[in-house]
Design a protein with these regions (language model features):
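C-terminal output helix
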Residues: 113-122, 126, 130
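Two-component/phosphorelay signaling modules centered on CheY-like receiver
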Residues: 18-36
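Receiver (REC) domain active-site loop signature in two-component systems and cognate sites
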Residues: 62, 74
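Non-catalytic signal-transmission and effector/linker regions of two-component phosphorelay proteins
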Residues: 1-12, 25, 137-152
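Active-site beta3 strand of CheY-like receiver
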Residues: 52-58
């Protein structure tokens, strides 16, 4: 996880419905997470560029740029591909779930969102993110050692 104020994970919540944003924000602040809000897919893409976001909760049905497209763009970029994404949507058909998975989402929740389920999934995704970061640092360290050994 990237360094944050007081080491709180930073979660970007993207939904064009402001009451939904505020509800999800309240759920996440209850578990001591920093939140940033976005009502638009293009705005969300801009907000992740600084590398400070640890996880994204992403609505699917938004005007201008769907959550599917936002997810696909984030997962195809080397800078953002490792940010976990939980899609949240009223779409529950198998085809919609398949489309979400094919766009690169890490998890999928149906609306209305259950607070306990959301919190559990967020904690799991953050734990996986931490382990992935540690693994990448370890692999870089091993690579450096191998390089030094080859040069000696």
């Amino acid at each position: 996880m990237t360094a944050k104020a007081e080491n709180k994970p930073k979660i970007l919540i993207v939904d064009d419905n402001v009451p939904n944003l505020e509800l999800l924000q309240a759920y996440l602040e209850d578990i001591d997470c920093q939140t940033e809000l976005s009502t638009d897919g293009y705005d969300a893409l801009e907000k992740v560029k600084d590398g400070s976001v640890d996880l994204i909760i992403l609505d699917v049905m938004m005007p201008r740029l769907s959550g599917f497209e936002v997810c696909s763009r984030l997962k195809s970029s080397p800078e953002t591909k490792n940010i976990p994404i939980i899609m949240v949507t009223a779409l529950t058909e198998l085809g919609d779930i398949e489309r979400a998975i094919n766009s690169g989402t890490d998890d999928f929740l149906s609306k209305p969102v259950n607070k306990l389920e959301l919190i559990t999934r967020v904690r799991t995704m953050l734990r996986i993110r931490d382990l992935t970061d540690k693994l990448e640092r370890t692999l870089e360290y091993i690579s450096e050692i191998e390089s030094k050994l080859e040069n000696n």
